[in-house]
Amino acid sequence: MEKIFLLHAAARSGKNTCADAMKDYYVNSYHKRVLIIAFADYVKFVLDKYYNTPAERTEEYRTRIQQFATEQVRASDVNYWANVVSDLLVAIQEDWDIVIIPDWRFGNERVALISRFHEYGIPVKTMLIDRPNIEEVDGMTEEQRAHSSERNLDNYQNFDYTIINETSQMQKTIQQLVDLIDEEENN
């Protein structure tokens, strides 16, 4: 594994679209093996498998995810989801060159991953996806928008990179950013 990217953005700002575009560009232009893995993958798996709550895009499901992942599990172990993902990544690190985590929501997740992967010499880079003029997110209540999982990084200032998601230019912006990152690492 060469590097890990943590992507952060407001809901519906293009985190998954950005992750997919980064993956496509790394695969097609740099011939890298790229894994997209989300902290929420495990949350959704546990809810589906053990709580009989299958994933769906509803107000009730989003509330359930927020309550379960944050108030229940993180309250017990603030690094639980970061540790689950990092444990798997350590075990499979030889299989992937680039890892993209498109749902970074809490500062401690970054700290936990940096701490874990420092010993392997694998950098963890942060990326903000900023979507100007984003409209109110359909399907989210005021409480969901105010939830700590949506607001925790609002005042975070130390992103390694920022992508302005003006949808029509996003692919080009990502390509330029990936090229810049590659150039920085090779100089």
Language-model features: locations:
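ATP-dependent small-molecule kinase phosphotransfer cores
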Residues: A38-V99, R105
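Conserved lysine of the Walker
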Residues: K15
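Small-molecule kinase domains that catalyze NTP-dependent phosphoryl transfer to phosphate-bearing small molecules
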Residues: N79, V84, K125-N187
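ATP-dependent NMP and nucleoside kinases share a basic, alpha-helical "lid"
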Residues: V85-E143
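Hydrophobic positions on the alpha1 helix immediately C-terminal to the Walker A/P-loop
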Residues: C18
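P-loop (Walker A) phosphate-binding loop of NTP-binding proteins
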Residues: A10
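Post-Walker A helix-loop "phosphate-sensing" segment adjacent to the P-loop in P-loop NTPases
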Residues: D24-L35
